């Protein structure tokens, strides 16, 4: 469904660094934007690529990788359209190489990094509005429609049940795993969505070695 976040378990050196820093299997995130808008009407993902920057790729681009689909819950059609429009407006922006070099330096040196510093390291970057990494691009797009990912609950909660106040995290501090951890995204398993029937599995007579 357009607006779904697709998490990817990559195997490059940078992917390994991201997975270590975030203590997660997920090193990359894409946004499913639906129709490419071209004459081919190809279904596409939007991502921030190291070499090509923010781009559209075919839906099947990561078909050989371990994936997880995270679907925003109760997203209205209007907000879904605004979300995708915001993300598409970043097409052509370049990748935030400063953030990449921070991760490469960490991977080469392999310092002892306390847990409390890991998010801060990921949050490093150039800060330029025309540069992004995969998860910050998607996080900024969701924040543009006020959709929560992992907000911070403020102390302004009254004794008589007033609505609590939430604070946004800066979008540069989000990592792919945050969409998996968010209570506001539903994890979708494609094999179940298409109608899984365990009785249709053909089992071999012996166990795998």
Residue ranges and their predicted role:
Residues 1-209:
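Cysteine-nucleophile amide-bond enzymes
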């Amino acid at each position: 469904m357009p607006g779904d976040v697709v998490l990817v378990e990559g195997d490059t050196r940078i992917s390994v660094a991201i997975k270590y820093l975030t203590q997660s299997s997920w090193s990359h995130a894409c946004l499913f934007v639906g129709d490419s808008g071209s004459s081919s009407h190809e279904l596409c993902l939007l991502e921030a690529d190291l070499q090509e920057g923010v781009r559209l790729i075919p839906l099947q681009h990561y078909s050989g990788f371990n994936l997880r689909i995270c679907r925003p819950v109760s997203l209205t059609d209007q907000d879904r359209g605004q979300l995708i429009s915001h993300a598409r407006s970043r097409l052509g922006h370049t990748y935030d190489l400063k953030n990449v070099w921070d991760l490469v330096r960490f991977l080469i040196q392999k310092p002892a990094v306390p847990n409390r510093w890991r998010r801060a390291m990921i949050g490093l970057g150039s800060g330029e509005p025309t540069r992004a990494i995969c998860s910050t691009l998607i996080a900024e797009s969701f924040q543009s429609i006020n959709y929560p990912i992992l907000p911070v609950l403020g102390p302004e909660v009254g004794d008589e049940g007033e609505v609590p106040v939430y604070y946004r995290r800066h979008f540069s501090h989000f990592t792919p795993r945050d969409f998996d951890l968010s209570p506001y995204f539903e994890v979708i398993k494609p094999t179940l969505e298409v109608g899984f029937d365990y009785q249709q599995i053909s089992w071999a007579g012996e166990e795998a070695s």
